[in-house]
Amino acid sequence: MPLPKIDDWRELSDEEISEQILATKKELFELRLQKATRQLEKPHLVRHAKHKLAQLMLLESQRTAAAKEK
């Protein structure tokens, strides 16, 4: 499974981005919990979740900065 591209997220609305951020944070928490209890079978999913979260937060900050300029 390749890392998600930022272009995949650009089409989402602001509300959907916020929802995705919350869902990704929850997913990352669950993955960390599995890692701590040694139940994580696919450790690369932690990296993917972090990457996805960074992309979504970047988009959110870019959109808020663009909204402030207007």
Swiss-Prot record:
This protein's name: Large ribosomal subunit protein uL29
GO MF: structural constituent of ribosome
Family the entry assigns: Belongs to the universal ribosomal protein uL29 family.
Keyword Metal-binding included in the entry's annotation: no
Ribosomal protein keyword on record: yes
Keyword terms of this UniProt record: Ribonucleoprotein, Ribosomal protein
GO cellular component: cytosolic large ribosomal subunit
